[in-house]
């Protein structure tokens, strides 16, 4: 069995090597002739999977995408050909939620405005939005959710209207899929009018899709309104962001908010499990066997004096400033953007760090934030 896999997808050898012959490809430049004799295709969001890509293949048995979203896959076409498809919903939700939370702490420290004093709007309450809200809940930050799609589907959480939240929130964190049609399109959800409506001193974070914000309008508004603080992990026109925008952003990274080792491993492992089911096999690998040990065995934390101490603890696991610096130095062009994503292998989630003697102490809440608690 021939398996075509994106070269930037981790743990493919370990997991899929037992199932067939693996050939790695550049997911962004993948061509139909490269898939002519493939049995399995494993992709990320940079590959458009559609009839044009698969036109030379008549034997494909499985397509897997190690992503939360599916907007890059023509699922209707795959269904018409009887090709099983799976993605990895929620695989990197924890990583995205922790990224957003750390970014808020970084802004709070930089501008001496405690996050605890902020009101946060989480726009999009799916996997990543829920993970962000979970971090805010653990720390005791007032927050509200907006998700008209989930509200219409009967989700029993309390939701608010978007424009109501724009007027209310000090911080807005975006976690929606990109859609152009339907009752609630998200393409340019934040257009010039909504950007102008942001509260004085508002923080705007985008960890979902670049085109959820009109980036040209954002440049124009930000040049006039220096009070607005920006965190952008995603950009309109990726992998070539508008260069005029980058210097205006407080924290800038190349679409790596979900790029933790745990998230990457979880995504690939979910595809492995799905393919095993399609083949009627029992997988021989386990998820936890994929992860290397954290550089710290454990840490004693009996108290956190202030928000700076919390940020220091978070930086022990992931220092977002490093990626911001690296991106500005070498990641803003097409090649640098993709290279940084490809080589991003250092990020861990809070759960990698074990806290000793935290149970029953005043920092027991850190387990709800995601840190491992060993007693």
Curated annotation (Swiss-Prot):
Binding site for NAD(+): 147, 233, 258
Broad enzyme group: oxidoreductase
Metabolic or biological pathway, per its Swiss-Prot or TrEMBL entry: Cofactor biosynthesis; pyridoxine 5'-phosphate biosynthesis; pyridoxine 5'-phosphate from D-erythrose 4-phosphate: step 2/5
Gene name of the record: pdxB
GO biological process: 'de novo' pyridoxal 5'-phosphate biosynthetic process; pyridoxine biosynthetic process
Function field: Catalyzes the oxidation of erythronate-4-phosphate to 3-hydroxy-2-oxo-4-phosphonooxybutanoate.
Active site, UniProt feature: 209, 238, 255 (proton donor)
Species this protein is from: Shewanella amazonensis (strain ATCC BAA-1098 / SB2B)
Keyword flag Repeat: no
SUPFAM superfamilies, alphabetized: Formate/glycerate dehydrogenase catalytic domain-like, NAD(P)-binding Rossmann-fold domains
InterPro entries from the UniProt entry: D-isomer_2_OHA_DH_cat_dom (IPR006139), D-isomer_DH_CS (IPR029753), D-isomer_DH_NAD-bd (IPR006140), Erythronate-4-P_DHase (IPR020921), Erythronate-4-P_DHase_dimer (IPR024531), NAD(P)-bd_dom_sf (IPR036291), PdxB_dimer_sf (IPR038251)
Name this protein carries in UniProt: Erythronate-4-phosphate dehydrogenase
């Amino acid at each position: 069995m021939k398996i075509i896999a994106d070269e930037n997808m981790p743990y493919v050898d370990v997991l899929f090597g037992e199932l067939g012959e693996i050939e790695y490809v550049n997911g962004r430049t993948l061509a139909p002739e490269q898939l002519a004799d493939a049995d399995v295709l494993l992709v990320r969001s940079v590959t458009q999977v559609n009839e044009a890509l698969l036109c030379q293949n008549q034997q494909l048995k499985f397509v897997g995408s190690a992503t939360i979203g599916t907007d890059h896959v023509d699922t209707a076409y795959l269904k018409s050909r009887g090709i099983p498809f799976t993605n990895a919903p929620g695989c990197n939700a924890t990583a995205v939620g922790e990224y957003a939370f750390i970014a808020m702490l970084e802004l709070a420290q930089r501008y001496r405005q405690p996050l605890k004093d902020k009101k946060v709007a989480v726009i999009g309450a799916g996997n990543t939005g829920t993970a962000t809200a979970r971090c805010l809940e653990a720390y005791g930050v007032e927050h509200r959710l907006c998700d008209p799609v989930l509200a219409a589907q009967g989700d029993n959480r309390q939701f608010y209207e978007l424009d109501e939240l724009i007027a209310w929130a000090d911080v807005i964190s975006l976690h929606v899929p990109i859609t152009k049609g339907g009752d609630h399109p998200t393409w340019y959800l934040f257009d010039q009018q909504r950007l102008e409506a942001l509260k004085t001193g508002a923080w705007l974070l985008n960890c979902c899709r670049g085109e959820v914000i009109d980036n040209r309008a954002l440049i124009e508004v930000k040049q006039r309104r220096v009070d607005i603080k920006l965190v952008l992990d995603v950009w309109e026109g990726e992998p070539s962001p508008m260069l005029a925008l980058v210097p205006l952003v407080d924290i800038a990274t190349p679409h790596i908010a979900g790029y933790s080792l745990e998230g990457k491993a979880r995504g690939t492992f979910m595809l492995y499990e799905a393919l095993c089911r399609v083949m009627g096999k029992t997988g021989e690998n386990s998820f936890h066997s994929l992860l290397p040990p954290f550089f710290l065995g454990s840490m004693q934390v009996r108290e956190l004096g202030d928000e700076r101490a919390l940020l220091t603890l978070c930086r022990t696991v992931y220092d977002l400033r490093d990626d911001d610096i690296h991106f500005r130095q070498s990641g803003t062009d097409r090649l640098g953007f993709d290279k940084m994503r490809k080589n991003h292998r250092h990020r861990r989630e809070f759960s990698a760090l074990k806290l000793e003697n935290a149970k029953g102490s005043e920092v027991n809440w850190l387990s709800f934030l995601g840190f491992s608690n060993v007693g």
